[in-house]
């Protein structure tokens, strides 16, 4: 999911990214990431500026409110992951495994990609973008959560057990969508998404150094 946009310029320009050096791959992906961030900012600049001003006016309360909803989503994720571990003891989410491999290869780039790029782009697309298209609150929440979860899982499915990971990913997506409907402020879900991803990558990096 993180690197999807980077393939578009490569297809248009007929670039073979796999032939790039490691440094070349990082620079290419960083350039396309920054370009996509700029495009989304231009498209949603009015919403982003307005929501940022409103969010920072009462930053402490807004963060506390958003944190409570994120915590519920994390609890659901933990419970569902424990059930998956019980059913398939050696299983690991394909998306998580792919991200771990990339972290091992390009740690600094992946910290930026996971902690900043992904929350910004995914919240604007899966929360703001979908909400603009679907007016019914409940249909929007389910649609946003299911699409978010599916795109994090489907591309890495290799066994039927991998489909079980739709539950934790969709539950987190539903949590972020519900949070956005409650606050009508994209930074509520964006900050919690960034917190979630940063904690995840931080714990992984700490674990690999112990």
Predicted regions and their residues:
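Membrane-water interface of alpha-helical transmembrane segments
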Residues: 19-29, 64, 68, 135, ...
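Alpha-helical transmembrane segments
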Residues: 1-4, 68-76, 141-147
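Alpha-helical hydrophobic membrane-insertion segments
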Residues: 8-9, 26-42, 63, 75, ...
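Transmembrane helix-loop-helix hairpins at the membrane interface
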Residues: 78, 82, 86, 104-210
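Juxtamembrane helix-loop-helix connectors linking adjacent transmembrane helices
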Residues: 14-24, 48-118, 210
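Structural signal for the C-terminal ends of transmembrane alpha-helices
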Residues: 41-51, 179-183
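Alpha-helical transmembrane segments in multi-pass membrane proteins
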Residues: 1-47, 95-97, 109
């Amino acid at each position: 999911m993180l690197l999807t946009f980077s393939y578009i310029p490569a297809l248009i320009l007929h670039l073979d990214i796999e032939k790039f050096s490691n440094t070349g791959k990082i620079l290419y992906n960083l350039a396309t990431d920054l370009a996509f961030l700029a495009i989304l900012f231009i498209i949603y600049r009015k919403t982003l500026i307005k929501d940022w001003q409103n969010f920072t006016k009462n930053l402490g309360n807004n963060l506390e409110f958003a944190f409570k909803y994120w915590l519920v989503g994390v609890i659901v994720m933990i419970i569902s992951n424990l059930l998956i571990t019980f059913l398939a003891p050696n299983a690991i989410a394909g998306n998580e495994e792919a991200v771990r491999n990339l972290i091992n290869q390009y740690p600094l780039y992946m910290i930026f990609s996971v902690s900043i790029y992904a929350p910004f782009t995914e919240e604007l697309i899966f929360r703001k973008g979908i909400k603009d298209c679907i007016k019914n609150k409940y249909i929007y929440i389910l649609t946003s959560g299911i699409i978010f979860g599916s795109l994090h899982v489907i591309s890495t499915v290799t066994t039927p057990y991998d489909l079980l990971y739709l539950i934790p990913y969709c539950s987190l997506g539903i949590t972020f969508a519900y949070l956005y409907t409650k606050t009508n402020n994209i930074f509520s879900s964006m900050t919690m998404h960034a917190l979630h991803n940063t904690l995840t990558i931080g714990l992984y990096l700490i674990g690999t150094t112990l």
